[in-house]
A protein has these predicted regions:
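Predominantly five- to eight-bladed beta-propeller fold
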Residues: 43, 85, 90-93, 132-168, ...
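Beta-propeller domains
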Residues: 30-51
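A generic tandem-repeat structural signature
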Residues: 72-101
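Conserved beta-propeller blade repeats
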Residues: 12-27, 61-78, 84, 113-128, ...
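Short loop/turn segments that connect beta-strands within beta-propeller blades
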Residues: 49-53, 100-104, 171-175, 219-223
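Internal hydrophobic scaffold segments of catalytic domains
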Residues: 98-137, 169
Length: 241
């Protein structure tokens, strides 16, 4: 029997994030593979055709870990494929590329002034974006870090001090970006039903983060938020419609 070596782990392939197309004819998913040079993973989009029962590869640049279907049954994902766009990405701008399931070259369609870490198509054809927001971006120094809250570090995340996960509603047609909560509220776990967004969040600033986030209901049509469970009042598990 051949021994397992370090390079053996570079051959693993991880399937994730499967979703049906809006017309129900295909399933798109991501396959990620370890990459020694970047000490990370390369991720590409694949399609399973329910009618033909075939699998095809859609992207090959290794930058499609985060993606979403569009209402027109195409695929979009944040990436930066030119030197100028990569430089803007370092400064906190995300660019969305669109590609047809039938193949072809992905084209840059839109951009948002935020670091997007997740995207989902909403029933009203807008998108729910997960954004990594740095409240100290303009004052953060390269030579040292300021720690004024706990926790200030996360496994696989690095320094997290003053950084928050935020939800925003994005209209790609108009470019309008509407945040669900303020910049110091850390959002996590969501569920969508019709025009309602159910999510958990914990508002905190330069203090100790609690372990009991609140549960909120956001109306996608009116932009109104209703508190269902106040923060620190009780411990909750996974919530869903």
């Amino acid at each position: 029997m051949k021994k397992i070596e370090i390079d053996t782990f570079l051959k693993f392939r991880f399937l994730s994030n499967p979703h049906f197309s809006p017309d129900g004819t295909k399933i798109a998913f991501t396959i990620s593979v370890p990459d020694r040079e970047t000490n990370g993973y390369l991720s590409d989009l694949y399609l399973y055709d329910l009618g033909k029962k075939t699998v095809s590869r859609v992207t090959c640049a290794g930058d499609a870990k985060i993606w979403s279907w569009t209402a027109e049954n195409t695929l979009i994902f944040p990436a930066a494929r030119t030197a100028s766009l990569k430089k803007e990405k370092e400064n906190g701008t995300s660019f969305f590329y669109e590609i047809s399931p039938s193949g072809g070259e992905a084209s840059c369609r839109a951009s948002v002034p935020a670091s997007v870490t997740g995207i989902r198509l909403l029933p009203d054809r807008r998108y729910l974006l997960t954004i990594r927001h740095d409240n100290y971006k303009d004052t953060r120094k390269k030579s040292y870090e300021v720690f004024d809250e706990l926790p200030f570090w996360g496994n696989g995340q690095g320094y997290t001090n003053a950084k928050r996960n935020r939800y925003a509603i994005y209209d790609m047609g108009s470019g309008n970006l509407t945040y669900v909560a303020d910049e110091w509220t850390d959002c996590s776990q969501y569920s969508v039903l019709g025009n309602l967004l159910l999510y958990k969040a914990y508002p905190w600033k330069q203090s100790v983060m609690g372990i009991r986030p609140g549960v909120y209901l956001y109306n996608l049509s009116t932009g109104e938020t209703k508190t269902l469970i106040a923060p620190d009042s009780m411990r909750t598990g996974v919530q869903s419609f």
